[in-house]
């Protein structure tokens, strides 16, 4: 009976260990941290002085660990300054070490935006600093994208695209990010993304005439040249809608009537194509492209 009792207790201890072990592991992850906001900020400040990437990384990991624990404590979580420190820490991680936390951009953005909104404060300077921090983080990604395109050697479209997308996580309606992000997406054959970015810009209707014309033409070209990707080849319905809008905004621009002719020819609408070509030639009798299209049309008719 004694042996059975011993075995029973050994069995219980084993189960007890299995139950408590995860708790000890999770708890030990925080054991080196005290949940002190000032200490978290101190780690961040030290990291900014380091030139060695390894040292900087290690300090930011500690800053993250300290602030993560601190923000679970109610007295810290209700203070705007705590959110500001958290935002700055995640902003620093987002700039160089996204592998530490892939959601660092979103966390920094949410923290900055919470100050003065979700987290009330009368500290106007702190609210202003939070806005500046948010703008600086966005500018960082935009500058990285531009450098990838224009820095040296061949443009790195992959890096540029990634950085523009990062900037749009902060300001989703940033016109620069949408405009150039759309252009870069085209270079990477991400036509659905490019169309989405351009559609947002068209809806916002705040670009210059030149850039508005560009996004209309780019959108139409994508739909026309890659109609199979967008279920367009049988009708070109989306293309025609954009062409109609473009013609209303830019009535003197020959691109829109010309692409209309190309669509009519693709759809084998012979009479429609002929009439459009003849009307365009009356307005622009020296247009070589129109004469070529007319010749092709009559050649195909036999």
Task: Give the role of each language-model region.
Residues 32-49, 76-96, 122-152, 176, ...:
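Amphipathic alpha-helical repeat scaffolds of TPR domains
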Residues 70, 115, 167, 201, ...:
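Canonical positions in the second alpha-helix
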Residues 1-37:
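Bacterial Sec-dependent N-terminal signal peptides
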Residues 57, 93, 98, 102, ...:
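Structural motif corresponding to the intra-repeat A-B loop/turn of tetratricopeptide repeats
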Residues 53, 60, 105, 154-157, ...:
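TPR-repeat structural position
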Residues 73, 118, 170, 204-208, ...:
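Structural marker of alpha-solenoid helical repeat scaffolds
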């Amino acid at each position: 009976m004694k042996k059975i009792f011993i075995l029973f207790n050994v069995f219980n201890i084993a189960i007890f260990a299995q139950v408590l072990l995860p708790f000890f592991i999770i708890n030990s992850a925080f054991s080196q941290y005290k949940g002190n906001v000032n200490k978290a900020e101190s780690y961040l400040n030290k990291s900014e002085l380091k030139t060695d990437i390894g040292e900087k990384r290690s300090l930011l990991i500690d800053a993250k660990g300290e602030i993560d624990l601190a923000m679970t404590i109610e007295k810290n979580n209700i203070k705007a300054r705590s959110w500001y420190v958290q935002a700055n820490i995640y902003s620093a991680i987002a700039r160089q070490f996204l592998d530490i936390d892939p959601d660092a951009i979103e966390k920094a953005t949410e923290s900055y935006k919470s100050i003065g909104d979700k987290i009330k404060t009368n500290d106007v300077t702190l609210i202003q600093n939070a806005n500046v921090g948010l703008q600086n983080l966005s500018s960082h990604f935009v500058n990285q994208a531009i450098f990838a395109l224009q820095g040296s050697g061949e443009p790195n479209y992959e890096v540029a695209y990634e950085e523009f997308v990062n900037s749009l996580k902060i300001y989703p309606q940033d016109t620069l990010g949408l405009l150039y992000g759309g252009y870069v997406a085209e270079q990477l054959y991400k036509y659905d993304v490019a169309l989405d970015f351009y559609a947002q810009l068209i809806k916002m209707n705040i670009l210059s005439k030149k850039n508005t014309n560009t996004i209309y033409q780019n959108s139409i070209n994508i739909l026309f040249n890659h109609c199979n990707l967008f279920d367009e080849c049988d009708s070109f319905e989306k293309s025609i809608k954009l062409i109609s809008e473009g013609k209303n905004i830019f009535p003197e621009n020959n691109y829109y009537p010309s692409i209309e002719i190309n669509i009519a020819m693709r759809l084998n609408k012979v009479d429609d194509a002929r009439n459009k070509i003849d009307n365009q030639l009356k307005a622009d009798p020296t247009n070589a492209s129109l004469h070529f299209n007319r010749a092709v049309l009559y050649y195909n008719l036999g």
